[in-house]
């Protein structure tokens, strides 16, 4: 039934009034719905939006919806830190929806996206049941797409990760190393770990592993779990998974872990989805702006979660706590400041009244 509704676009008719309040078009609903399965077709579905501003904003926000590739990350964090609590997965979808709503409101107040959403006009076809052939073809396309992705991108990146974590310089010579901290991967992770220090990814000297996992997630989100599996030796633990959860729990606090989860949900998607964004934007500057906005938003939200969460749970008050409060104040200002168009309109109306 859902496939039939998506195919006929009947479900977006009642969403237009709601989406317009957030600066989006009702047609943005379909890309976001499809994006819950995979970001690539979700981004491509934005082609149905005629207005260029609305289309670009939809492209930038569609991947905030947790896709299927992000579900293993949600399951891993929920199992390791929150006792498989169901609220973790539920909250991830609410975080994604909140990011879309807030982004729509804030971006619509900028010069790049200013203006009312385009009027919703479309020809509604008759309701129809989805055919079996369409359902099977859709299942095959999505299944085959994942098989190709798993056999190429994920496999290749896993091999590269294995090489980087198995080789390094030890005793002045290059070769296989026994200590993971002497590997090439450790050196790379240590070099970039300081960037994520304000997010709390530094417990017990494990920050470089979190940094590496987050970066490999840009290749494919499934790589986050695969990276942890290689770094913590998931294949060598018991079937009940107790050692897995223990290893991860020793690497981060629960608050930092939830921030890590939110970062991976909101930051730039996988390479395939980024390629789709590049094609749909058809402009390098817009592509870089979209990726930069997604990564920047993910970083700031994760920072606020960790700093404020740590303060509330009895942690210390430091310079990054002040930064977090400043970010929240700035965010609230951008969210609730009046539209410039409304102000100029009021001035014109008052001027016309005085002239009369």
Give residue ranges: language-model regions.
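Juxtamembrane inter-helical linkers in multi-pass membrane proteins
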Residues: 13-40, 114-138, 181, 185, ...
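Conserved phosphate-handling catalytic cores of large alpha/beta enzymes
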Residues: 41-118, 229
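Membrane-interface capping segments at transmembrane-helix boundaries
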Residues: 109-110, 334-350
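Transmembrane helix-loop junctions at the membrane interface of multipass transporters and ion channels
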Residues: 64, 68-90, 275-283, 300-318
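Single conserved hydrophobic/aromatic residue that forms the stacking wall/gate
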Residues: 1-7, 12
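Extended, low-charge hydrophobic alpha-helical regions
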Residues: 9, 22, 43-55, 159-295
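Hydrophobic core segments of alpha-helical transmembrane domains in multi-pass membrane transport
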Residues: 78-80, 93-108, 154-166, 262-264, ...
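Long hydrophobic segments that form regular secondary structure
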Residues: 83-84, 113, 117, 127-176, ...
